[in-house]
Amino acid sequence: MGPRSGLLGLFALFVAGKCSYSPEPDQQRRLPPGWVSLGRADPEEELSLTFALRQQNVKRLSELVQAVSDPGSPRYGKYLTLEDVAELVRPSPLTLHTVQKWLLAAGARNCHSVTTQDFLTCWLSVRQAELLLSGAEFHHYVGGPAETHAVRSLHPYRLPKALAPHVDFVGGLHRFPPTSTLRQHPEPQVPGTVGLHLGVTPSVIRKRYNLTAQDVGSGTTNNSQACAQFLEQYFHDSDLAEFMRLFGGDFAHQASVARVVGQQGRGRAGIEASLDVEYLMSAGANISTWVYSSPGRHESQEPFLQWLLLLSNESALPYVHTVSYGDDEDSLSSTYIQRVNTELMKAAARGLTLLFASGDSGAGCWSVSGRHQFRPSFPASSPYVTTVGGTSFQNPFRVTDEVVDYISGGGFSNVFPRPSYQEEAVTRYLSSSPHLPPSSYFNASGRAYPDVAALSDGYWVVSNHVPIPWVSGTSASTPVFGGLLSLINEHRILRGLPPLGFLNPRLYQKHGAGLFDVTRGCHESCLNEEVEGQGFCSGPGWDPVTGWGTPNFPALLKTLMNP
């Protein structure tokens, strides 16, 4: 029997009906609000699918993250290289051989992997993909404010049982591109403006968080920072230049990004893309900045998953990454969540600081078997990222103390147990808060978030050459906090110290030193008689609305400069 007939025999064995399993039985497959089907995809249309191959030594990877991130460890700051991580997690030869043979037999082509070899992306026709992934049925969909197009299957898929030890999930089937949660308020009318401000700008941020004109990058190090875009929108260099002309006059800054990873289209700029770039580069002023851009992606690809693949394929990356993406934990399969968590763990082992927005739905709300519960967000709930909540000025027109922004996401994971680094802080909150919701609404033993916060209300943004006021959301607070951490990395690098890396173990050991404690306000939740729209409330120390608080830059710099 020739090699081709052998492959066909292998493929026939793999697709035999009863010997199959579902890798993601709990994946939500409902069409998101605002999306509509345009009909079945043509059988000969090409799809790009990503196969997540089973990794090795994940427990050892977790131990190494703890060792390199804990200031009390002799390995603190001795981060792994991408090649070190690849040696650790690379799938077994049996896994690589089995999956490659299966895909080759199915007619997959133009397959490419990443340095860590734990993802394999291949092109197949719709006909081949539906045969390969039993049960899948691909349709064209359109939705979201930008009329984004996607090819997805809302049907469960199954894989040959022989692949169960080798494949975690297949990307490009169920998960739809995210949409923006940014809000824009009408501009308030204020009689007289002496001593007042009419919205958050870089100068307001620098005043509130005690930055001086000297708190900028030196331009002499290899320090860099990045933001990632997963929405179907763009930023424009001309908007960034205009933003800095209007608002960057009192500090040294860069007026263009150093590198765009991905494709920048020529369409209209998006407010969220503009916001991320403008405030990362004004908070982390004069520091080289990358933008990971998803526009131009194929309709069958998942933008967030593609970003994770990029991290697994670049040896030299920016030290700080800010990300404004999130999904409800319950909308994602447990297999997908656990695998993405491992990808975030890989980044932490390499000394990358990943900051994720906590979300803009407060504690969230959903109904389970007729009972309301809070609804945590992922990756905000991952124990391997630093999650950023949101605040408002007590007086929205003055640089005052901060209070909770009621939309600030926060709560307790239903997937991840509470990590040891936050045990003391969370236990103290749960035992001392006078305003806890009923225990049936949240998992008190889960990973609690956010970890920190910053202003998230009333920002000025320049988009499509137009200054736009009163833009709000944790998509604003996240790049601000990230930029300040980049400034601290600058000082550490100049002193010969390693970059901050995964911040949480150190952050919780310091008990909020270097941060303004936000003690007033509660965020929103379920609109029912039991909780009446109130989720968790802030209080002294850590809380699940604003974390440890907002940055006091000189004090935070001092706190984080110790080796």
UniProtKB/Swiss-Prot annotation:
This is Tripeptidyl-peptidase 1. It holds the Pfam family Pro-kuma_activ. Activated by autocatalytic proteolytical processing upon acidification. N-glycosylation is required for processing and activity. Residues 20-195 form a propeptide. Residues 1-19 form the signal peptide. The keyword Ribosomal protein does not apply. Disulfide bonds join 111-122, 365-526, 522-537. Gene3D superfamilies: Peptidase S8/S53 domain. Ca(2+) binds at residues 517-518, 539, 541, 543. It catalyses: Release of an N-terminal tripeptide from a polypeptide, but also has endopeptidase activity. Glycans are attached at residues 210, 222, 286, 313, 443. Residues 199-563 form the Peptidase S53 domain. InterPro entries: Peptidase_S8/S53_dom (IPR000209), Peptidase_S8/S53_dom_sf (IPR036852), S53_propep (IPR015366), Sedolisin_dom (IPR030400), Tripeptidyl-peptidase_I (IPR050819). Keywords: Autocatalytic cleavage, Calcium, Disulfide bond, Glycoprotein, Hydrolase, Lysosome, Metal-binding, Protease, Serine protease, Signal, Zymogen. It comes from Bos taurus (Bovine). The active site is at 272 (charge relay system), 276 (charge relay system), 475 (charge relay system).
